[in-house]
């Protein structure tokens, strides 16, 4: 290793020159010690390989002959390769890509197959074509709706049923007990009694109510044109409301003066006596 190389390495590593030189010297010594051994191994390897390469054995010769014969007699697996390279051959083979059916077409084919199966099943079962179409369209089988149940709040309870029985029993018992005690006139048919009562009420009402006398015809009032015009003028320009000042003055005019009480007159006389000045005595 040159000094320039060693200096560059030391500068790149950032080590002091003294330490770097000592390390590089040690590495050079070790390399010089190992070099002769490496050279000896390389020489021995080359000597062993050279005779095999230079002097071919009988086995290698036989192998090369067989290989050359087979290579010349080989037939190409792909004949298009030879046609493509042949200059006399006019037609050139074009590789056509493999046609793949799209997935959409496969789905449509499956749908058609299912429809054909369903139609074949319907035809085997029988029926008109209209029914077949309806059955094919209505895939979901509709279940019949159950009848609605009556709500619980409309059902009679045990208490209400017992009360109804009690009232009916009481009515029947009262009829049995008090029916024989009534006079024979009261045992008449209820429908006849009701008709008699209605006839009696109608007669009494017709006797009591006085007959209405026919009302005299109304005579339309004749108004002059001047009255109608004055009424319109009053309605337009008559003051319906009063201002606050006018209303206060109107109240003061209509206000009644109450008579003074005796206590007020007595107090005024007393106050006047106090403030009265008497003549001084000389």
From Swiss-Prot:
UniProt entry keywords in alphabetical sequence: Cell cycle, Cell division, Chromosome partition, Cytoplasm, Cytoskeleton, Mitosis
GO terms (BP aspect): cell division; establishment of mitotic spindle localization; mitotic spindle elongation
GO MF annotation terms: microtubule binding
InterPro entries tied to this protein: She1
Low complexity bias: start-end ranges: 117-128
Basic and acidic residues: bias regions: 163-175
Locations listed in the record: Cytoplasm, Cytoskeleton; Cytoplasm, Cytoskeleton, Spindle
Region feature Disordered, mapped onto this chain: 28-58, 115-185, 207-229, 242-282
Cellular component terms (Gene Ontology): cellular bud neck; cytoplasm; nuclear microtubule; spindle
Pfam families recorded: Msap1 (PF17077)
Biased composition (Polar residues): 242-268
Organism domain of life: Eukaryota
Function according to Swiss-Prot or TrEMBL: May have a role related to the spindle integrity, which is essential for proper chromosome segregation.
Family that this chain belongs to: Belongs to the SHE1 family.
Name of the protein described by the UniProt record: Mitotic spindle-associated protein SHE1
Biological source species: Candida glabrata (strain ATCC 2001 / BCRC 20586 / JCM 3761 / NBRC 0622 / NRRL Y-65 / CBS 138)
Gene that this sequence comes from: SHE1
């Amino acid at each position: 290793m040159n000094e320039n190389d060693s200096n560059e390495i030391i500068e790149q590593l950032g080590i002091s020159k003294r330490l770097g030189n000592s390390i590089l010297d040690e590495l050079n010594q070790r390399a010089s010690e190992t070099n002769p051994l490496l050279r000896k191994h390389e020489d021995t390897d080359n000597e062993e390989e050279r005779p095999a390469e230079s002097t071919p054995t009988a086995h290698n010769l036989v192998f090369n002959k067989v290989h050359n014969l087979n290579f010349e007699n080989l037939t190409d697996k792909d004949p298009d390769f030879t046609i493509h390279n042949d200059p006399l051959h006019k037609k050139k083979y074009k590789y056509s890509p493999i046609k793949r059916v799209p997935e959409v077409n496969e789905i449509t084919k499956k749908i058609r197959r299912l429809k054909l199966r369903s139609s074949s099943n319907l035809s085997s079962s029988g029926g008109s074509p209209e029914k077949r179409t309806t059955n094919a369209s209505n895939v979901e089988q509709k279940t019949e709706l159950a009848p609605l149940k009556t709500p619980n709040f409309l059902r009679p309870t045990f208490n209400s049923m017992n009360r109804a029985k009690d009232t009916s029993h009481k009515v029947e018992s009262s009829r049995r007990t008090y029916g024989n005690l009534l006079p024979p006139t009261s045992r008449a048919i209820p429908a006849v009694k009701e008709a008699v009562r209605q006839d009696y009420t109608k007669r009494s009402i017709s006797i009591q109510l006085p007959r209405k006398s026919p009302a005299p015809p109304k005579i339309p009032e004749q108004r002059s044109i001047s009255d109608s015009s004055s009424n319109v003028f009053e309605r337009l320009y008559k003051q319906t409301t009063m201002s606050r000042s006018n209303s206060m003055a109107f109240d003061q005019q209509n206000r009644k003066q109450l008579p003074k009480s005796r206590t007020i007159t007595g107090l005024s006389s007393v106050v006047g006596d106090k403030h009265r000045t008497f003549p001084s005595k000389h």
